[in-house]
Amino acid sequence: AAPGIHNAPDRLRVPLKRVGERGENRWQEISYEQAMDEIAERLKQVVDEYGPEGMAVSTSGWNTQTTQAADRRFMNLLGAPNWISGVSLCAGNTAAINRLTYGWFPMGDFQNTNCIVLFGHNPKKHSWTPIYNMIEGARARGAKVIVLDPRVSEQAEVADVHLRLRSGTDAAMCLGWLKVIFDEELYDKKFVAKWCTGFDELKARVDEYPLERVSAITGVDQALIAEAARVYATADGAIIPWTPITDMQISSTSAIRLHSILRAVTGNLDIVGGETLGGFNPDMI
């Protein structure tokens, strides 16, 4: 499929400018320089006549990975607020909450991690193939895989630990993990002391979720909840890869926030085998 798309005869390879009336399908090849100049002039006309609010931009690229937010920065400089993207339907919560928590969207170090946690995610050989391959590579090295999914998915079938929680109870499960991690002092005390704020308030909130309550909410046995929490917290480098499953469920905001907290309190940020934080290209800002 990819070669067919790449080599398709109707694939756009050079800028084309419409000549004649709309719908006549008459086009003229022009240079990139001319195209950019004419686009800039048209944008200037729109801003001059209607203000920057008269412009809308649609993009399909992830602003944290593909374009380094250059499209958003471009609109910001113009003063245009109308940005449309599939990200708002796919990873909007994740992108916003992670940035608010620790400044950037974390990326898992699959090549060196010793534990992978999949919240409802089911990468397969022919679906999410790059992630699937990285999981398989990590598993071959001996990394543990924890799957949280009501279904017995393909990943769940070969997981080291499978928690068949009720749909939409991810946040409660995370609170249960934190309860085990705090009670057994499995958190990274140095990292928490240096980088985390509100720890006492967090611990007080977590204390409201003993494993009995979490088990009742999620439908998962207390011992299995505790086992999974220990595997994650004691791994020498662990990751919770992003998945759209979390973004598209009940209480997704709370669940994603708790994913962020789990990464932080276990010290799995910016370490080998953990999750790395990038940032904007310094040459762009």
What residue ranges belong to the model's regions?
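Short acidic alpha-helix initiation/capping motifs at coil-to-helix transition points
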Residues: 15-16, 65-66, 202-209, 253
